[in-house]
């Protein structure tokens, strides 16, 4: 999807917009401060697969709200607000959340 499509055609109900926007901003913050992956086992806030726990919880909630379309939209938003590398880490972090496959 292009930037304009994302701007004018949101993959979530309008009544969920505040929650979705808050969750996206939280993911951006996680990406910039903690990253979505870690290289060290046992890092607080990360699971045994070294994926960020809260980011996975957010992914599950986004899946409940708007499914794969919303998760893809969110990844594009994270990429626009951070870097390609960070968005790729999110892609792997979300593996097996809903229908998401890295």
Spans of features found by a protein language model:
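Short, charge/polar-rich alpha-helical segments
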Residues: 3-28, 39-40
């Amino acid at each position: 999807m292009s930037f304009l499509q994302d701007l004018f055609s949101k993959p979530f109900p309008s009544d969920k917009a505040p929650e979705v926007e808050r969750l996206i901003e939280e993911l951006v913050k996680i990406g910039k401060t903690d990253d979505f992956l870690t290289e060290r086992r046992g890092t607080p806030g990360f699971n045994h697969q070294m994926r960020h726990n809260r980011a996975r919880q957010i992914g599950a909630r986004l899946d409940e709200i708007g499914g794969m379309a919303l998760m893809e939209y969110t990844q594009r938003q994270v990429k626009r607000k951070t870097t390609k590398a960070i968005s790729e880490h999110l892609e792997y972090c979300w593996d097996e959340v809903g229908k998401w496959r890295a």
